[in-house]
């Protein structure tokens, strides 16, 4: 069935999803401009990256519902998604870590940025980076989350360096990390934890540099749950073989 044979409403819906995904390029551009702004507009940078995070969290589901790959087969939204993801999940956060966070002397900070950017390719270029039960296999280059936690929790340089190196290595190790919406096991708990984490994080960004202990505890517990869910899946072993996957959605 050719594209023209689908109802106009279906074609409009499919293109609307593609436009939503492409809007990530706008949010990425605004975030990058805020990062390099002379006044160091880091709050706005995180606002735009959080907007991009929300878009990335829903566009995959909408794409499947709108059957975009079937209705517009010649336009690969998965490639658009990968470009946007690399910018918003990896590149801009890595630059932010170099520019704004205590990451050691400048040469070391630059080396760490290079390690983050290059090691992430083993995630984005990995055709088997997601298991058949929808866990990410290897750290999924979620440097926006790592950098955001460093920022709002105001962690010291030594901690930042050690954690960065650990996650660089974990990108290459077949440990598991839960997709909050697509993993069936603990799905309700996963989604609830994401919502709680997101709201608490937005609050901390808004009131930065304040960091009430109650909000810190909420973030640590909700974020820690995802790490625990991944550990539990890793301990179960290779029950499901990895599957080809082009996007993180």
Where are these regions (language model features)?
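C-terminal membrane-associated helical module and adjoining short loops/tails
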Residues: 1-5, 136-249
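Active-site-proximal cofactor/substrate-binding loop regions of enzyme domains
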Residues: 7-69
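Short, amphipathic, aromatic/basic-enriched membrane-interface segments that mark the entry/exit
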Residues: 10-19, 75-83, 129-137, 180-188
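Multi-pass membrane catalytic core of lipid/isoprenoid biosynthesis enzymes
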Residues: 17-26, 65-123
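Hydrophobic alpha-helical transmembrane segments
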Residues: 23-34, 55-61, 87-89, 133-141, ...
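Helix-coil boundary and interhelical linker segments in multi-pass alpha-helical membrane proteins
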Residues: 30-48, 83, 87, 91-112, ...
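Alpha-helical transmembrane segments of multi-pass membrane proteins
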Residues: 49-56, 115-123, 167-174, 222-229
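C-terminal ends of transmembrane helices
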Residues: 61-70, 119-134, 172-181, 228-236
């Amino acid at each position: 069935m050719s594209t023209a044979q689908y109802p106009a409403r279906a074609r409009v819906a499919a293109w609307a999803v593609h436009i939503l995904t492409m809007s990530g390029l706008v949010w990425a551009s605004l975030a990058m401009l805020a990062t390099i702004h002379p006044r160091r507009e880091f709050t706005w940078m995180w606002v735009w990256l959080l907007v991009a995070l929300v878009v990335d969290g829903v566009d995959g589901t909408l794409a499947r519902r709108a059957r975009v790959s079937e209705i517009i087969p010649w336009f690969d939204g998965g490639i658009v998604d990968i470009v946007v993801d690399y910018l918003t999940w990896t590149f801009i956060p890595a630059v932010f870590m170099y520019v704004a966070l205590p990451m050691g002397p400048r040469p070391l900070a630059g080396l760490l940025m290079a390690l983050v950017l290059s090691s992430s390719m083993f995630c984005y270029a990995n055709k088997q980076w997601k298991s058949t039960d929808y866990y990410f296999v290897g750290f999924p280059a979620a440097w926006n989350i790592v950098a955001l936690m460093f920022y709002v929790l105001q962690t010291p340089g030594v901690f930042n360096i050690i954690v960065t190196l650990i996650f660089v290595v974990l990108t290459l190790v077949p440990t598991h990390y839960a997709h909050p919406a697509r993993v069936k096991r603990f799905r309700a708990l996963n989604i609830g934890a994401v919502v709680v984490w997101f709201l608490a994080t937005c609050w901390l960004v808004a009131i930065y540099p304040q960091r009430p202990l109650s909000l810190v505890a909420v973030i640590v517990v909700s974020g820690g749950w995802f790490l625990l869910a991944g550990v539990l899946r890793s301990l179960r072993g290779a029950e499901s073989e990895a599957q080809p996957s082009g996007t993180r959605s």
